[in-house]
Amino acid sequence: MTESHIDFRRAKFLISAPDIAHLDQYLPGDVGVEIAFAGRSNAGKSSALNALTEQKNLARTSKTPGRTQLINVFELDAQRRLVDLPGYGFAQVPLAMKMKWQQSLAEYLQKRACLSGVVVLMDIRHPLKDLDMQMIEWAVASEIPVLALLTKSDKLAQSAKMKTVNEVRKALAEFGDWVQVESFSALKGTGKPKVLSILNEWCHPQWLANELENQDNAE
């Protein structure tokens, strides 16, 4: 099947849900393709989503990290969605709330059959914290490909940036082809073409081709 190019600028807000159970209630079944964005509360997740879709206010940025508790879903087309998962790991969030978020994130990664890939965003100056590794391990254990995206790359000189990227690639080499590592700057746009290329590939898994073919045959 020839892959069509997905225009991520067409992303539009679909729904918000407090947890995975409610997500199942709101969405039309566990079908099509979802790409999830996860990261620590200060990883620049909202800024990255806005930069990738070229929409300033698609994902709301907050001056208070950890405030976004909802799972926010954005629609690309009838079959494809981007899912903005709650930020994790912020110190000022109560422990009970942290545990609830982590349980919800784990549940989503393990149970969502239409999940085609996970972008784990990390500040390039502070990569691979414990919860980042946990997210990556959960995804790979569920056989979901991961893009470890090192954000805010404009904060480092080119040599320091490449050094960090190589160190993270080495640290994640045990996961083989399941994990890719790239750097990205929402401010400068550096790394954007590569990220969009990976997302576009994830938008065309074989199971979606089979689903669409079955629909055509049924008609």
Swiss-Prot record:
InterPro entries: G_ENGB_dom, GTP-bd, GTP-bd_ribosome_bio_YsxC, P-loop_NTPase. Residues 31-205 form the EngB-type G domain. Gene3D superfamilies: P-loop containing nucleotide triphosphate hydrolases. Its cofactor is Mg(2+). GO terms for biological process: division septum assembly. The keyword Acyltransferase does not apply. GTP binds at residues 39-46, 66-70, 84-87, 151-154, 184-186. One of its GO terms (molecular function) is GTP binding. The keyword Zinc does not apply. Mg(2+) binds at S46, T68. One of its GO terms (cellular component) is cytosol. Transmembrane segments: none annotated. It comes from the Bacteria. Keywords: Cell cycle, Cell division, GTP-binding, Magnesium, Metal-binding, Nucleotide-binding, Septation. Necessary for normal cell division and for the maintenance of normal septation. PANTHER family: ENGB-TYPE G DOMAIN-CONTAINING PROTEIN, MSS1/TRME-RELATED GTP-BINDING PROTEIN. Belongs to the TRAFAC class TrmE-Era-EngA-EngB-Septin-like GTPase superfamily. EngB GTPase family. This is Probable GTP-binding protein EngB. The lineage of its organism: Bacteria, Pseudomonadati, Pseudomonadota, Gammaproteobacteria, Alteromonadales. The gene is engB.
